[in-house]
Amino acid sequence: MRIRVVPRKWFLDRRGTDEEKMVFGTMNIISIITPPYPKDGFEDEDIPFSEEYRNAGNVLVVKFHDTEKQWNDDVVLMNESEADRIYEFVQRTMDNGNGAYMVHCTAGKSRSQAVGYVLNEWFNGKHGVRPDQLAYDEYEGLYGQSRTMNSLVRRLLMNRFFGDSLKVAPL
């Protein structure tokens, strides 16, 4: 299964184009949006693709901040409910003929990388080793920017996708 992780800007640059139409016709999309953060005056992040695709069956939109700790009441953390939504979306769409997943968050480096990592492990089982058995340096060599991956997102999704056979501790 092909998994592609991109920044939000990738979709913004293609909004309303034939390429956007092709992507939504051939891939399943997981869109991670940053919710508002009133204390900093941050508005709700807009979904970066055309209106016609926002409620498509091959699109899932989730909203949570790119943080691993609840440091004030306005922070929306990834939680088990969101992990369930992602898992159920993948279960529902994996046989729809699209054959690939595209995941985005604001920068395409932390939340979406964690989702892409788990999907890759679940679909492709690369490298013949479970991810919880990889040393940090091995992991970084295999997956690139590991130090930017949101470990809360990774842990919740690994636990949801791999169940009780694999309980992942934070990186």
Language model: regions and residue ranges:
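Helix-loop module immediately N-terminal to the HCX5R catalytic loop
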Residues: 58-102
